């Protein structure tokens, strides 16, 4: 099964080539593509706030501890917005720079979207949107002021919201520290510190045991779920899950050294490009333009190693990430 799954990953290459072809053949495609993303993005943001204030979204879907909008039981609203943010921001700067009134409207949407990510309680998504912000602020030539202003205004709004309703703050900050055993000295002395949480720590140890037993090729793509209950891999009550919740650890466990080295090579090439751009920037030049840096900030999210992540082989997550590539080719 894992061989079949791996084989059909060529579809992502077809997806990128198809978009590149459309970009080259139709001058209006960028505009159509932008307004399509704009529609999806805006509807999600407005519906997310509607659900937050009313307890249910426009379709009547309620939420428990976290805002989900149209995603229902799937708590991926923050992840979806944060990952779509870089390509949307990049295209916005390209399409709306001549329309100042509309551009200020988009700034408002960006501020509201960043705040909504915080309200959704998705901690990884909140980290990613801030990582993208810092990336753009550090490496762009003209957009850094705009991105910095949006970030500051978003933080101010988040602070105000946290005072009015501290639930989101507890989920994103307080609960995170609690799960890592950083707030309870007695528990810390008894159990030690955890990597993000006890659940994550057990997943990571289990995945590492799988790697030690299958160093070259791993246990197979999407096979963590099938082997995590094996006694020789179990590391505690939270050993099992659909995936290890970290891309690099998942690749190590499921594809072994071969797959892991390929991912590290991609990370190395990416860092080399960014290092080259940084050198150019210090000389008042640019290796990448601001539009490309915005897109690269989206790729940086996927390559950042030290954060809990979704399934590396998740089709939806991969498609959103690949949306950045055609505009860089």
Kindly label every feature range from the protein language model.
Residues 1-8, 35:
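Membrane-anchoring hydrophobic segments
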Residues 10-14, 18, 28-63, 71-164, ...:
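Alpha-helical transmembrane segments of multi-pass inner-membrane proteins
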Residues 108-109, 242, 246, 274-308, ...:
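Loop-to-helix entry and N-terminal half of a specific, functionally important transmembrane alpha helix
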Residues 184-255:
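Long extracytoplasmic/lumenal interhelical loops at the membrane interface
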Residues 254-276:
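Selective detector of the "anchor" transmembrane alpha-helix that sits immediately C-terminal
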């Amino acid at each position: 099964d894992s061989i079949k799954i791996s084989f059909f990953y060529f579809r992502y290459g077809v997806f990128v080539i198809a978009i590149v072809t459309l970009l080259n053949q139709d001058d209006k495609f960028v505009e159509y593509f932008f307004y399509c993303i704009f529609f999806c993005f805006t509807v999600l943001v407005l519906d997310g706030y509607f659900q937050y204030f009313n307890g249910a979204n426009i379709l009547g879907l309620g939420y428990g501890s976290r805002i989900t909008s149209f995603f229902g039981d799937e708590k991926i609203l923050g992840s979806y917005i944060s990952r779509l943010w870089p390509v949307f921001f990049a295209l916005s700067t390209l399409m709306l720079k001549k329309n100042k009134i509309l551009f200020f409207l988009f700034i408002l949407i960006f501020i509201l979207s960043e705040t909504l990510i915080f309200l959704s309680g998705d901690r990884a998504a909140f980290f990613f949107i801030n990582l993208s912000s810092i990336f753009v602020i550090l490496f762009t030539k003209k957009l850094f002021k705009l991105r910095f202003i949006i970030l500051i205004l978003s933080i101010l709004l988040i602070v105000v919201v946290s005072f009015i309703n501290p639930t989101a703050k507890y989920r994103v900050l307080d609960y995170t520290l609690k799960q890592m055993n950083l707030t309870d000295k007695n528990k810390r002395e008894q159990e030690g510190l955890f990597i993000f949480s006890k659940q994550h720590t057990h997943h990571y140890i289990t995945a590492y045991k799988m790697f030690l037993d299958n160093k070259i090729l791993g246990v197979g793509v999407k096979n963590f779920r099938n082997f995590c209950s094996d006694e020789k891999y179990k590391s505690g009550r939270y050993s099992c899950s659909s995936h290890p919740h970290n891309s690099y650890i998942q690749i190590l466990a499921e594809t072994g050294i071969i797959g892991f080295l390929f991912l590290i090579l991609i990370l190395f090439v990416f860092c080399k490009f960014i290092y080259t751009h940084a050198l150019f920037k210090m000389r008042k030049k640019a290796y990448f333009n601001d539009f490309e840096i915005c897109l690269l900030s989206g790729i940086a999210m996927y390559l950042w190693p030290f954060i809990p992540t979704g399934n590396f082989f998740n089709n939806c997550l991969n498609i959103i990430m690949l949306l950045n590539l055609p505009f860089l080719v």
